[in-house]
Amino acid sequence: MVKIYAPASIGNVSVGFDVLGAAVSPIDGTLLGDCVSVTAAERFSLHNEGRFVSKLPDDPKQNIVYQCWERFCQEMGKEIPVAMVLEKNMPIGSGLGSSACSVVAGLMAMNEFCGQPLDKVTLLGMMGELEGRVSGSIHFDNVAPCYLGGMQLILEQEGYISQDVPGFSDWLWVMAYPGIKVSTAEARAILPAQYRRQDCITHGRNLAGFIHACHTQQPDLAAKMMKDVIAEPYRTQLLPGFAAARQAAQDIGALACGISGSGPTLFAVCNDQATAQRMAGWLQNHYLQNDEGFVHICRLDTAGARLLG
């Protein structure tokens, strides 16, 4: 039996729309991500369990893990009879890379079970393709950090898809999911087709400055560069309470605050435990909208997807 855990991820990280992503894991050891296990069987089967199992499609063939198995078998040129179990711990439409977690765990579990016939670049390419079936377009800003860990800059050049960006070990990422769903397609549709030149210049400066600050280990500069002029000004209207949360983050002393992916999850970056706890407390009391919501204090997950058994 092979069991894979794939962690949650922050798409865009405010400053890198569609080209930057970061994997995160709670500091208390909670598994914030999906697990997929694979065992030998006479015929294929897929069983779903976990906290958010009720949100999965009724038709098994619409389940992205079924599609992972199907795509992997296609790549291998044969049908591989296995029993798969998806442990769905991630809310769907949350902005935490939920579909990426299932895709990464599903494909990596199949690859490990079969003795790693596919290399990482090939597997990551397939992950992006399958993620595209869910979100409507191939993009790697969730699957790359989820699979490889840490912060990943999506380059798609010279035979590789992404490269690692060094993070800051003392940063704490407070993640708050309010318990409502935002459609990725809707969140993309709300964005303008064209941008003003000044916004393009600001975006380029912020992203270049952030990547430079990460590589030269300047956390204050990196935090100042974490501004989103591409998506956040337009998506705020889809996220009740986000503007108030961003103001609270500033008042509490967070270094930065932004939308995780297309939302509704937000993240706030803090550089000490006391600030992170205050931020988490505020979000717990003011940003969550129902019992499905949660807040976690996280660090960058530098390991990425990994074997649990």
Curated annotation (Swiss-Prot):
GO terms for cellular component: cytoplasm. It catalyses: L-homoserine + ATP = O-phospho-L-homoserine + ADP + H(+). GO terms for biological process: threonine biosynthetic process. Its main location: cytoplasm. InterPro entries: GHMP_kinase_C_dom, GHMP_kinase_C_sf, GHMP_kinase_N_dom, GHMP_knse_ATP-bd_CS, Homoserine_kinase, Ribosomal_Su5_D2-typ_SF, Ribsml_uS5_D2-typ_fold_subgr. It is an enzyme of class 2 (transferase). ATP binds at residues 91-101. Keywords: Amino-acid biosynthesis, ATP-binding, Cytoplasm, Kinase, Nucleotide-binding, Threonine biosynthesis, Transferase. Its EC number is 2.7.1.39. Pathway: Amino-acid biosynthesis; L-threonine biosynthesis; L-threonine from L-aspartate: step 4/5. It is found in: Cytoplasm. GO terms for molecular function: ATP binding; homoserine kinase activity. NCBIfam families: PRK01212.1-4, thrB. HAMAP family: Homoser_kinase. Belongs to the GHMP kinase family. Homoserine kinase subfamily. Catalyzes the ATP-dependent phosphorylation of L-homoserine to L-homoserine phosphate. This is Homoserine kinase. The gene is thrB.
